[in-house]
From Swiss-Prot:
GO biological process terms, semicolon-separated: body fluid secretion
Gene Ontology CC annotation, any one: extracellular space
Compartments (UniProt record): Secreted
One GO MF term: G protein-coupled receptor binding
Propeptide residue range(s): 24-63, 101-105
Physiological role: Regulation of fluid secretion. Stimulates Malpighian tubules fluid secretion.
Entry keyword annotation includes Iron: no
Proline amide PTM sites in chain numbering: P96
Signal peptide span: 1-23
Keyword tags: Amidation, Cleavage on pair of basic residues, Hormone, Secreted, Signal
Organism encoding this protein: Camponotus floridanus (Florida carpenter ant)
Name of the protein in question: Diuretic hormone class 2
Amino acid sequence: MTVLCTLMAFVMVVAISSLTVDAIPHSHESYWDQQDDIDRDEFLELLSRLSRTVMNRPEMENSKRGLDLGLSRGFSGSQAAKHLMGLAAANYAGGPGRRRRSEQA
């Protein structure tokens, strides 16, 4: 019985390994090509038009909905230090806040 099972398994392995299937040829058409996608001249024209729009409209500079590239009012280091000092003072037992009557006596 084991000889028959071993022989059958060997025949199956040989039959499966003898079948060769060629893969579909790989195509690069679905990849994004950075060189062909955006024309350099068009990109520079877009940037120049955007800068002219911002320069011609001074109210955009102080507007809430102006163009913000993340360079205007960020969270500075001194603000972070003040925040951490406030947290430390709030957690300190003798720090700011309302005093309990039991602590005042």
